[in-house]
């Protein structure tokens, strides 16, 4: 079963502001997640059904929610890890 990637409207705006090289790196990792989105080491505590993708070199993070019933990976937030901003933003959006 292959999952489909969808963006929340606000996450899409964040995505479009990213440098093309960073978008490509995230796209490559998201493509891998389409086959197996439930990666135990990437699971976020405190936010239900959410996982992260890390780009260590640039410090960017992408937070996505897995919706198994519809086979969807919903991108919740994209941003820098600094001060856990992207995780706090994702947590707010999931409420």
Swiss-Prot record:
InterPro entries: RelE/ParE_toxin, RelE/ParE_toxin_dom_sf. Keywords: Plasmid, Toxin-antitoxin system. The keyword Protein transport does not apply. Pfam families: ParE_toxin. It comes from the Bacteria. Belongs to the RelE toxin family. NCBIfam families: RelE_StbE. Toxic component of a type II toxin-antitoxin (TA) system. This is Putative RelE-like toxin protein. It comes from Escherichia coli.
């Amino acid at each position: 079963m292959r999952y489909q990637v969808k963006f929340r409207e606000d996450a899409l705006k964040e995505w479009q502001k990213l440098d093309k090289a960073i978008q490509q790196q995230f796209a490559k990792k998201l493509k891998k997640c389409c086959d197996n989105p439930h990666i135990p080491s990437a699971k976020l505590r405190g936010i239900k059904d959410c996982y992260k993708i890390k780009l260590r070199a640039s410090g960017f993070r992408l937070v996505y929610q897995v919706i198994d019933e519809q086979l969807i990976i919903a991108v919740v937030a994209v941003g820098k890890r600094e001060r856990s901003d992207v995780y706090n933003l994702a947590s707010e959006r999931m409420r």
